């Protein structure tokens, strides 16, 4: 079984580590930084466990490998889930749009705060992830941004 939390509250970060652009940044996914997300992972795990135990499926499903049937407390389950957790979302929100440069990267017209002539036009400006594929939202962001760029160029 596989499942993903579509509305996580945890927020990661990307930090510049050197003035040289060739030096990789520090990426902290912080996947379970918020207790709410850990609780949702536990709920999903327990749901999968109950589905696997359903009489119609039980004959076709082998023994639970991780964390094992003996693990029944949050303290026993969470460390095992942490070994398997990964981000299932397309990356969004790394350059969030907003009005305040202290907690956002771009303004409402996709312009990077404090840097003239630079815009970001992709899903990284979306402050929260969408509950689905990002292709459509990416095209919508690009379409609207193109219109704004043309408006700004015309004066």
Give residue ranges: language-model regions.
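FAD-dependent oxidoreductase catalytic-site/capping-region signature
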Residues: 1-137, 145-155
């Amino acid at each position: 079984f596989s499942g993903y939390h579509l509305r996580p509250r945890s927020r990661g970060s990307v930090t510049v580590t050197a003035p040289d652009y060739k030096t990789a940044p520090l990426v902290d996914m912080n996947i379970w930084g918020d207790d709410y997300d850990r609780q949702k992972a536990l709920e999903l795990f327990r749901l999968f466990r109950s589905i696997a135990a359903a009489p119609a499926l039980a004959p076709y499903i082998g023994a639970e490998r991780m964390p094992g049937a003996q693990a029944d407390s949050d303290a026993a389950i969470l460390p095992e889930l942490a070994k398997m957790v990964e981000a299932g979302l397309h990356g969004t929100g790394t350059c969030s749009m907003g009005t305040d440069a202290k907690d956002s990267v771009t303004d409402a017209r996709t312009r990077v705060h404090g840097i003239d002539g630079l815009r970001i036009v992709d899903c990284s400006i979306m402050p929260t992830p969408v509950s689905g594929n990002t292709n459509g939202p990416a095209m919508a962001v690009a379409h609207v941004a193109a219109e704004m760029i043309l408006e700004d160029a015309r004066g």
